Amino acid sequence: MANLPIIGIYKVLYSYEPQEINPGEEIPENEREISIVEDEIVCLLEKGEDDWYLVKRNVNSNDDDEEIGIVPSNYITEAEPSTKMKALYDYTQQSVDEISFQADQTLDCYGDTDSDWILVGFNNNFGLAPRNYVEGMDASSAPASQEPSASGVNAPTVSAPNSMVSPPPSFQPPSAAAPATSLPSDYNPPPPPPPPPAVEDQAADANEPDDYYSSGRAVSPEIPPTYTPKQADPLPAPPPPPPPTLPPQSTNTSQLPMPSRNVNNLGSQVNIPPPPATPSQPPRPPTNASTRSTGTSSSMAHSYDSPPSPSSPSDAYGDPNQHLKLRTDSHDDSRAYDSSSSMGNPAYEKWEVREVVGKKKKRTGILAINNKSIVLTFTKTMDAAQVWPVTDLVNYSSERKHVFIEFNSDSGITSLHLHASSNTNADNIIRALGDVAGSARAAGLREIAAASGSPMPKLPSDSALHRLNAASDAAGVNGGRTGDYEMSTVYGDRSARAEDHKPKDSSAGQKMGTVLYDFIAEAADELTVKANMRVVIVNDTASSDWWKCSVDGKEGVVPSNFIKPDTEGDAKSPPSSSKSGQGSSLSRRASKHESKHKRDSKHEARPESKHESHRESKSAEKDKKDKKDKKEDSKRSRSHSVSKPDSSKLRTWTDRTGAFKVEAEFLGYSDDKIHLHKTNGVKISVPSAKMSYKDLDYVELMTGKKVYSRTERKKDTQKQSHDHGHSHSKSHDREKEKEKKKDREHRKHRETEEEDEGPPPQPARPESTRPALAPPSSSHSNDKYDVIQERPKISYDWFDFFLRCGVDFTVCNRYTHNFNNEHLDEACIPSLNPDTLRTLGLKEGDIIRVMNHVNELNGVSTKPASAITPETKSTVNQIMSGGEALAAPVAVPAPIPAPVAEPAPPAAPAKEVVEKAPSPPATRPKSTTPQKFDDDAWANKPVTEPPVRASSVTVEPARVTESMNKMNISEEAKKPEAPSRPRTAPIPEPEEQKKAPVEKKDAEKSVQAPIPAQPTGNITIQNAYFTAPQPMAADPFQSPLYVQPTGFQPPPSALPIQPTGYMQPIPVQATGYQPLMVQPTGLQPHMTGVMPQVTGVMPQMTGVVPQMTGVMPQMTGVQVQKTGAMPQQPVNYGYQVAGMQPQATGIISQPTGIRAQATGIMTQPTGLHTQATGMMQPTGMQPQATGIMPQATGMMQPTGMQPQVTGIMPQSMPMQPQMTGVQVQKTGMVAQPMLSQYTGYQQNYTPTAMPAADGYGMQPSMNDTQAYYNMNAQTPVNYGFAGGQDTSFGYEQQQMYSPMQQQQQQYYGTEMQPDMGYQQPMMSNYYDPMQMQQQTPYGYNQTGMEGYSEYGYAQPAGNMANPMSYDPVSNASLYMPSDYNQQTQPANYYDSSFGGAQGANEAGKKASIYQATPDNPFGF
């Protein structure tokens, strides 16, 4: 850095010691700090951009003493010339530190003039000059006897001709110069020249340009960097001037050699006592210098502890009226600049800028700065000029062309975002702001002196600060000082206002705060405050939104977000001086600005304040900009010698797409790349293929080389024009869209700014924040703050309250927290309503629980309707829905009625069970206490229609019970169902079925009746059969047994059950599939697929009883013994649920059923009682199959067939069925429902596809080669399992029925078990016409409907006998042992299987159609 020329002579204002560095750390010379001493003269080599100047000290001393380094720019100021001297000879500089001048030129001399080399300057050129080449301007007045000067020559007079002046001595470098001891012994240095008179000093001050920037010093002509160290060989001396004509005695002295530069240092220091407290140093310049610029400027702007931005040596910019007309409001004296200010109306430095408003909008204007004001005027709008005093400047920074300025105003911090025309202008604006801010804030030093009680030393008369203070005192404007520097008014009226608003009752122990925004009281207990007021915070704990404050003896509440509390240090720090009020004023002013600085830097904004959040976002943006500034500064400060492009060679370069532009200097072209030097000093290389053709033409012009192909350019141009023609409309639309989007964004941004302009929103008034609070006491009725302060703490245990309401304990804590936050207590419980609970975060279910509990506390009844209402309603719904709901168990949400705790007597009829249930109340009891809410949707509503329906339904079970009582059913069947199932008792509408006409039309109308009857009957019968003897099967197999026992019950006790049983068999047929299917799923398919058949069958079933009764006597007479066997069918049916047994056992009884089916004529069954049952066999037959299945499935043993083969076997049979039944019920019943449903479902579709299989599809699907007996086996599969095709009974039974039933029994016992579930696809109809006729009327084919009698089986009686005897199916005795018909079963056989349902047969009762009456339809 030694090769830098001197660009200025500066004087040190304050001593400075450099920061200590690590011994091993290497710091460049341009970043190394040096120590300076007050009043020392230093030479300025370079001005840094970060408020640090590169200087050289002891430049006119020995080389060993020279130091080069950086010092704070605000610690030095431009030196004033100590005197003026005149050049005696021409001199040409020999090194970079020297200066060239011509003879007779007037030079300004700085510092000591007695040394051999002195610092001089002229025309903004500075350097060292030989002392013997110049003379003082007052030499003519010196006496003639004056001794020779230090140069060894007599000082010539001004009028002396040059020819009389002796030639200068030859120049010797300092290293080669002779020591001082080599001077002649008679050499006596002359006394120093007297100081210039005051008049000349003032003239010099007046002649010196005041504008620091406008009078920028011109750098001396650049010298090639060929400077050699001072230790090099001596340079040849310049030719001496012509010798002046002087007396001979003076010629000897004229030949004295030029004095060497190794004379001792500068003259004596001025003994001015140092100031008591020097300003703190600016941020240390680290190696990367990343924190100098922004750190210094921001810290100086906010704190007195660190020096302000670099101060300007002068403050005169000229008369602003000669440069710029400012539109200002005449009444705003504090803002308007004063054109009559000191120092001859200081001028404004101005720049053209654009103010950035919002995202896209900009306003063009002119920024003017002088040492008193900062003015922004707008040239294209009529907006008034914005004027800010320099003392309001808080912060300033720049980022390339963007300048960010912040001012402190009455309304808070005002931010200004300006866009300069170039980076240079932005840098100049920042420098000017630093100068004026430093000049204004230097007054703080006087306040520090006053506060510390130490007198401020007098400034040198030639210092810039002295001139500034003197001018301010003379003008009497803001920024001046009193003559004794007691107090500064640099902060204007705002500091006075802050002092006026100082709380009078404040003390050291009270908490203080600063008001951020104006607040106007709207109530008696509120306090009106202004921004920047200092208030005493009396209480800030009672409420988080409102603080009680005191100011000027008045107390009131103020929004907490309008006050900035002081830190502990601020609150505890006492005023530094109270003698004259100056210290307290300073303390208040410092705390005020410190709080503003903290508020601006930390942005402790409350989230509820939009204004604060906006400021926070601005702060974040500012931090980003600061980081960028630091990065750029670090880059700039790494090396002050970073080369910048020549501004005269800059041009704008554009890429081929036109999207990117850059200002850079062209360096050269090579390797198909264009080398550019950008304005920021970065050098880049851009491929020529990416550069625009216009720039390529420029490169070709500069280099003379061909850079691109003209053909390629032509193609690109054509392509662009072609694309432009197609995309013009699209681009036009896009531009419109962009404009619209910009407009929308602009409007939105303006609205946001308008919202952000005001202070933050005030919190809710204290009385409205907590509606549940108790009213304030009378003594504080007019003080909202006292109400908040005295609010009691909520102690009610809401957690326990919610637990008592039945709320889940996992959410009670959250609800409790919400209630406590709202300060609710037990007094609020009566007024709780669903809306309030919902607002407090309760779930809907919990709201109902809480409201029920609240109603109980309020005396409002919340008991639900009696249990009979939902039961009755569900029963009615089941009846109306065709029994579908009855088939599937339905969970009733209503509570269990009283019979659960007090079960009915065992023999109580179903009617009593129903009557015992309480009837629902007609209306809901009204609350005795007034309710505070109208929403009672959660309360139980009165039920009107269901009770009416229930009353009609409850009558029917009585009738059914009476009819059932008339039947010979065992006591177990009469037992009522368990109290927990009251809905199983009623059997709907049996009388209607009795009275129903036989016509087809009426049968279709009453389709729904049998279906519900069937489930009801099933339930009753099943309870009779399964509940008492086999409790194991009651619960798990309850559903599967409903229909099957009912449907099959008629066959076992055909005579007794037919009144209802036949209604049941028909439902069984219709729903027989349904129950099985319904139980799991099959009810729906069954209803759908078989419904038509059911419809047809139901009337048949109703009418079948008489026919069968008519036939039964014949059958009874003929086959009484078989009637004994007949019960086996029920046994099988009971086990039929298992699905496989019916065939095994069913064969025994089935011969009847089968014969009836095969023959299709009732006559054949007529011979046998079993045949009568067989007539019902369409129903019964399938039950047989079903009944048999249990043996096959349940027994899975060959023995299951033995009962069928031999009459004796029944003895073993009963045991087998029982065992099988148990097995079936446990496993068969569980698995059976699924199999039967599945099977039934498929079987239903089989009849649908085949007209002959309309009924259950069993017989029609039989194979011609299949035995009659096998048909029976299939039937139970169909009936009981709802699909005979799905079992292997029929599959293996395709073989002809052999006389030896052992063979078939094996199929049932062995083969059938593994093959269960397999369909019988090969079966086809094998019936003689007689059998088909019988099937058809029974419901397998609708063609026989017209033959229905009252009970449904309308086959001619004559047809029943004859064919029966010849038909192997009708007359099973042909294939049975002779004693088969005489076989009997044990008395307990049927009871053990199905609960004793066959007790009638054991008693010897016989059914006779001739004795049948309406009350005794079976003719027992």
From Swiss-Prot:
It is a peripheral membrane protein. It is found in: Cell membrane; Endosome membrane; Cytoplasm, Cytoskeleton, Actin patch. Residues 589-600 have a biased composition (Basic residues). Residues 139-151, 173-185, 572-587 have a biased composition (Low complexity). Residues 187-198, 235-247, 272-286 have a biased composition (Pro residues). The modification Phosphoserine is found at S309, S311, S312, S454, S573, S577, S927. Residues 5-81, 82-139, 508-568 form the SH3 domain. Its main location: membrane. Residues 138-344, 560-657, 708-786, 902-1016 are annotated as: Disordered. GO terms for biological process: actin cortical patch assembly; endocytosis; regulation of actin filament polymerization. GO terms for cellular component: actin cortical patch; cell division site; cell tip; cytosol; endosome membrane; nuclear pore; nucleus; plasma membrane. Residues 326-336, 601-636, 709-742, 969-980, 991-1005 have a biased composition (Basic and acidic residues). GO terms for molecular function: actin binding; identical protein binding; protein-macromolecule adaptor activity; ubiquitin binding. InterPro entries: DUF1720, PH-like_dom_sf, PH_SLA1, SAM/pointed_sf, SH3-like_dom_sf, SH3_domain, SHD1, Sla1_SH3_1. Pfam families: DUF1720, PH_SLA1, SH3_1, SHD1. Residues 152-165, 250-271, 287-301 have a biased composition (Polar residues). The modification Phosphothreonine is found at T929. Keywords: Actin-binding, Cell membrane, Cytoplasm, Cytoskeleton, Endocytosis, Endosome, Membrane, Phosphoprotein, Repeat, SH3 domain. PANTHER family: ACTIN CYTOSKELETON-REGULATORY COMPLEX PROTEIN SLA1, FCH AND DOUBLE SH3 DOMAINS PROTEIN. Component of the PAN1 actin cytoskeleton-regulatory complex required for the internalization of endosomes during actin-coupled endocytosis. The complex links the site of endocytosis to the cell membrane-associated actin cytoskeleton. Mediates uptake of external molecules and vacuolar degradation of plasma membrane proteins. Plays a role in the proper organization of the cell membrane-associated actin cytoskeleton and promotes its destabilization. Belongs to the SLA1 family. Component of the PAN1 actin cytoskeleton-regulatory complex. This is Actin cytoskeleton-regulatory complex protein sla1.
